[in-house]
């Protein structure tokens, strides 16, 4: 079990100090009681030349203090100058406060990394914090995973790991869409492959059915289990048999595809389970909303612009979504008496709340962006605003090879499968590059570029940083033979290093980057943006590689100084800090941290 960090990290520590100063000023200055300091932040300045940290305290508290922001900033700055961590304080512009820290701060930050090891940056669980449910992938069980599913899968998995690292209790969930019309289409497509397995010439696949070869094994399995008996059955009899078999086999394939990417789920929840058995959760949810006056019989006006698939010109049961922030009210029951997809989704989210989740996160594909407002309205309604829903939209992936679009596969029929991509470039390249752009931006994924061994390939550059660190350790044993090989023993040995020997500005820049890791984890977790970890790792690796390169040209900057064991030990401690943080961040992203690379 990994221990939790026990002390506040540098940015959190400085934030606490700023809060204490502001609280003292509030008390002495007669500010209103109960001032909320949560808007006060301490973060790196956009321009590194402005210092090591910056705070907006004066800007956001000036109104309560009944003072000009710059005047309040000067009061805060005066007290910060007396802090033992601070070397210099500047007030800039209308009232921003920039801080430069004492050089000794950075060696102390490295000492923290060496002391905490894998726990560095990890947040201890907060007692009573809401449980988090992250729903991702949730692809229809109608075929193999394609490259579009891949991005949402990696994003949801990495986000879940990030939130767990940040101290949250997270459940990873897959919602199986096994109750809609698409599974009947799947069954009819599989039945055609069953007839083919029996020796029939089925000709071209009719329009509207799934054309890919991936259903041929389903047809063979049906033949093995039932012989030709299904052919004598009426549709109503064979359809559920074929449907259940096809769904089961497709879900097995989907789970295999997810395993190839090391995508994990704690729960696979069936949509059909909401409406089958003795407890119809969808009907219950509609009754729940009816009792509160949140559904009514009404007629929707025709949609403006493009037609909406769920609009029908008739009197129907509607959810009063506009009362909870949506643009229009939403149908719950179709003209044939079946539930709309939305009705099932409402019941699903109510069921999550009943299971104890108050923080809900859904990962949607780009084609579901219009679904966000209605789902957030539904969650407000069925939880009395006691739960929140954050919807993260994952944009499209353009699959390229040397800049040219990749052709579709025969097996899938009309898309490139996730498995094909993983088999060609490897799991690590897929996972890292799917996270190396913000989720709501279109991603160009070039199969040739992601396996290049160059600085232009981020996954290689970051992994190579970890491998280079271990290479330095191996080489160092020639001049420092007492350096242990085993990681735990090596870290314990390096804790005794005299870190004050790390005095070069380039070394301090690298230590500053390491000190930023806990703050990066915190901000990425709060924003639900795991790409921030990927960006940070690339920046850290870049600074590490740059320092190594400088040592090639300037011998006094080399990590291993043959005639100075004390300095070598201090620099190896710095390398250990880099290796530990790279491994930690890569673990959050689900990417391997190799000790050596060819």
Curated annotation (Swiss-Prot):
Monomer. Keywords: Aminoacyl-tRNA synthetase, ATP-binding, Cytoplasm, Ligase, Nucleotide-binding, Protein biosynthesis. InterPro entries: aa-tRNA-synth_I_CS, Arg-tRNA-ligase, Arg-tRNA-synth_N, Arg-tRNA-synth_N_sf, ArgRS_core, DALR_anticod-bd, Rossmann-like_a/b/a_fold, tRNAsynth_Ia_anticodon-bd. It holds the Pfam family tRNA-synt_1d. GO terms for cellular component: cytoplasm. PROSITE patterns: AA_TRNA_LIGASE_I. Its EC number is 6.1.1.19. NCBIfam families: argS (TIGR00456). The keyword Aminoacyl-tRNA synthetase applies. CDD domains: ArgRS_core. SMART domains: Arg_tRNA_synt_N, DALR_1. Signal peptide: none annotated. GO terms for biological process: arginyl-tRNA aminoacylation. A motif ('HIGH' region) lies at residues 139-149. One of its GO terms (molecular function) is arginine-tRNA ligase activity. It is found in: Cytoplasm. It catalyses: tRNA(Arg) + L-arginine + ATP = L-arginyl-tRNA(Arg) + AMP + diphosphate. Belongs to the class-I aminoacyl-tRNA synthetase family. SUPFAM superfamilies: Anticodon-binding domain of a subclass of class I aminoacyl-tRNA synthetases, Arginyl-tRNA synthetase (ArgRS), N-terminal 'additional' domain, Nucleotidylyl transferase. This is Arginine--tRNA ligase.
């Amino acid at each position: 079990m990994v221990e939790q960090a026990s002390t506040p990290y540098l940015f959190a520590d400085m934030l606490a100090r700023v809060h204490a100063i502001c609280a003292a000023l509030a008390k002495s200055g007669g500010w209103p009681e109960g001032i909320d300091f949560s808007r006060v932040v301490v973060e790196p300045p956009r321009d590194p030349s402005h210092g090591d940290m910056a705070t907006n305290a004066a800007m956001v508290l000036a109104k309560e203090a009944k003072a000009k922001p710059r005047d309040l900033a000067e009061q805060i700055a005066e007290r910060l100058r007396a802090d033992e961590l601070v070397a210099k304080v500047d007030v800039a512009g209308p009232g921003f406060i920039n801080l430069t820290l004492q050089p000794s701060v950075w060696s102390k930050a490295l000492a923290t990394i060496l002391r905490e090891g894998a726990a560095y940056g990890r947040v201890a669980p907060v007692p009573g914090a809401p449980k988090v449910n992250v729903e991702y992938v949730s692809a229809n069980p109608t075929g193999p995973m394609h490259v579009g599913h891949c991005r949402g899968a990696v994003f949801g998995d990495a986000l879940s790991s990030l939130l767990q690292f940040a101290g949250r209790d997270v459940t990873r969930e897959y919602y199986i869409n096994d109750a809609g019309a698409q599974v009947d289409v799947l069954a009819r497509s599989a039945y055609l492959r069953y007839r083919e397995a029996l020796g029939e010439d089925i000709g071209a696949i009719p329009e509207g059915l799934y054309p890919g070869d991936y259903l041929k094994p389903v047809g063979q399995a049906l033949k093995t289990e039932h012989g030709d008996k299904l052919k004598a059955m009426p549709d109503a009899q064979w359809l559920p048999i074929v449907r259940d078999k096809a769904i089961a086999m497709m879900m097995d394939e989907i789970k295999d595809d997810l395993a190839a990417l090391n995508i994990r789920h704690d729960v696979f929840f069936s949509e059909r389970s909401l409406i089958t058995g003795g407890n119809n959760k969808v009907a219950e949810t509609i009754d729940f909303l009816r009792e509160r006056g949140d559904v009514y019989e009404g007629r929707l006006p025709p949609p403006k612009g493009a037609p909406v698939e769920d609009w029908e010109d008739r009197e129907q049961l509607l959810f009063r979504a506009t009362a909870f922030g949506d643009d229009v009210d939403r149908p719950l029951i179709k003209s044939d008496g079946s539930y709309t997809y939305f009705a099932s989704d409402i019941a699903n989210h109510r069921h999550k709340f009943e299971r104890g989740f108050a923080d809900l996160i859904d990962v949607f594909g780009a084609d579901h962006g219009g679904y966000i407002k209605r789902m957030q309205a539904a969650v407000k309604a069925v939880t009395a605003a006691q739960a929140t829903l954050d919807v993260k939209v994952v944009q499209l992936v353009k699959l390229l090879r040397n800049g040219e679009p990749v052709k579709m596969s025969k097996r899938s029929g009309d898309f490139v499968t996730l498995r094909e991509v993983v088999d060609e470039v490897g799991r690590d390249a897929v996972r890292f590059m799917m996270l190396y752009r913000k989720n709501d931006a279109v991603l160009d994924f070039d199969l040739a570029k992601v396996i290049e061994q160059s600085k232009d390939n981020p996954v290689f550059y970051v992994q190579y940083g970890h491998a280079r660190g271990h290479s330095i350790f191996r080489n160092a044993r020639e001049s420092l033979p007492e350096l242990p090989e085993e990681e735990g023993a090596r870290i314990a040995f390096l804790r005794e290093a005299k870190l004050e020997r790390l005095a070069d500005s380039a070394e301090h820049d690298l230590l500053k980057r390491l000190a930023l890791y806990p703050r990066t984890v915190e901000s990425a977790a709060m924003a639900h943006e795991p790409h921030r970890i990927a960006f940070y790792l690339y920046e850290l690796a870049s600074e590490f590689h740059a320092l190594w390169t400088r040592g090639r040209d300037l011998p006094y900057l080399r990590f291993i100084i043959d005639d100075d064991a004390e300095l070598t030990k201090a620099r190896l401690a710095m390398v250990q800090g880099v290796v530990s943080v790279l491994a930690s961040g890569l673990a959050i992203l689900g990417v391997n941290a190799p000790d050596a690379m060819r």
